[in-house]
Each structure stands twice: as structure tokens, then as C-alpha cells.
Amino acid sequence: MTVNLDWENLGFSYMKLPYRYIAYYRNGQWEEGTLTEDATLHISESSPSLHYGQQAFEGLKAYRTKDGSIQLFRPDKNAERLQRTADRLLMPQVPTEMFVDAVKQVVRANEEYVPPYGTGGTLYIRPLLIGVGDIIGVKPAEEYIFTIFVMPVGNYFKGGLTPTNFIVSDDYDRAAPHGTGAAKVGGNYAASLLPGKIAKDKHFSDVIYLDPATHTKIEEVGSANFFGITKNDEFVTPLSPSILPSITKYSLLYLAEHRLGLKPIEGDVPLADLGKFTEAGACGTAAVISPIGGIQHGDDFHVFYSETEVGPVTRKLYDELTGIQFGDVEAPEGWIVKV
């Protein structure tokens, strides 16, 4: 079957594809999952996921390589992160083998929608874990649904990798010091909508959140992780229990050290130390790397490498990681899973 899509101009939006995966957790165990054409979830109106936010999700991609094969990038790490989130919300873990197999099933079932090599497009994969059933009152569900749907998405940067500017939020926190910041739960994203809108209304790309305890250290950039490059060839990124551990960030930390010869550093990133960075960026699944041109904080605006050009180290990191994902660059052992 040939799919007639404008592959070069795909955006990042929902598209209903023929198949998705669904599995039910009942009576203390996971039942065998299945592929279905039904894109609607049928759940009780009193499901804890609707009322109390007992839900978790993931995001990853499938890539078409030059030889036409399809591969995944570190799906086991997404499985492990979903397991940690499930533990935090008293939900049953989805075993890694079950997770990866389910991802493979749904990608294979919709493989004609994986964008061709060279278009920059990918098949975005959204696993979702929700508590369901007739529960009223604040307590964990007894039944759960694990589902995965997919859609083709385009290159995040249509005109090529481009820096954008961000603004520091002094009025809003992304997460509480001992809250759910390290978990990938919907509530964290719902809370980011208002500050994100305020930033965009001021013509910034998104918000930079500070640590919730002291408001002096950089934590996250919108829904992505922050990194900075110093003149001393250091790759620096924040470390905090309220930051979502990005698979992209940890991949970049490894590549920065082992492919580019940089010194990887995880630790506090004081806002007052922005001047030590010659380049900066945000990283995550959607864009891979979003170069940061400048950061506004109060009346101060700090420019890194350039507001219009991507720094050389950021460019090398982006090319190295995307090269691995699309099969053009040799991957570290265990990073690539063929579908």
C-alpha cells in the first residue's frame, strides 16, 4: 500500500492511522495486548486518570534509514522511564519486553506511514498508561489501560536548525521540590500551558523554569532539558530531582564525551553563571536540539553564540545524534533496535 502524503511538509499534529496497540491490566496482571482499529478509548466516567491525574505517557520515534529499514532509538530507556513514573503514581509497571514489543507491533502495522529517508520526517510514537474503572475518592485504580498510537511528523526545523529566544519565569514553577517533576505525567504539562502562552505572547519561544526551592538555578526549558557549552569544552546540564530525565539529554552527554571529546558535567546551573556558556540549547524527543539564541530575565537579555546562527558544537551534536537515529552514523552498542 502506498500512502500519498506531502512528506516534506508534515507538521507536528495528530493523524489517525489504521492501527494502535491496547492492553488491559485486570486482576493484578497484564492481559495480552492487541492491535485495534478503534481510535476511541471506552472508559468509566469515574476513572482516576480523569479526576486525579493517575496517568503517564512517553514519546519516542521510529526512523526510516537509507536502505529502507525502520529502527527505534533506545526504546528500552522510554520503558524504564515509564516504569519509574508508574511507581511514582502507584500504577503497575509495563515490563520492558512488553513495552518494546508493543512499540514494534504498532510501528510494523503502520509502517507505510514512516516517512521516507531524507525527508527529515519520523513516525512519532505515543505510549499512554491510564488508571480506569469505577473509582471515586482519591485512591489508585484497580484496572489500567496501556495503549500506543503513532503518527508521521515532519522535521521540527523546516528551514534548518535555527536559534530562538527564551524568557525566564519568575512567577511560575514547573514542579515542586519533592513533587512529580521527574515523572512524565500530564499534570506537569497542563501546568506549563499558561506560562508558555505568556512567553509566546511576548514573542519568545518558551519559558525557562528555575529551581522551585531557591529560584536561582536553571532547571527546564519549556518541556525540554537545558544544556550549555563552555569555552573550556564542557557540556553542562542541570541535575535536580524535579527535572524530567531526558533520554535525548543523556544521549548527548555520552556523545559529547565520547565523540566530541567534551567534559560532561551534571550539576547546578546558576542563572548568574550564564556568561560562562558560549552556546546553549534545549533538548528532547520532538526537536532533538533547539538552539537557544538568547535568554531574557527581567531587564537583562543574554545572547550566547548568536541569535541567528547555530554554534559549531551544537551543530556537531545535532548531526551526530540525528545521524545515529537515521542510521548514517555508527551507534553506541544497544542504542538502536530494528523493527
Role assignments for model-derived ranges:
Residues M1-V106, L128, I135-V339:
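Helix-start/capping segments and mature chain N-termini
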Residues T96, V106-G118:
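Charged, gly/pro-rich active-site loop segments
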Residues Y113-G120, E330-G334:
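Short glycine-rich, low-complexity/disordered patches
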Residues P116-I130:
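Extended, Lys/Arg-enriched charged tracts that mediate electrostatic binding to polyanionic substrates
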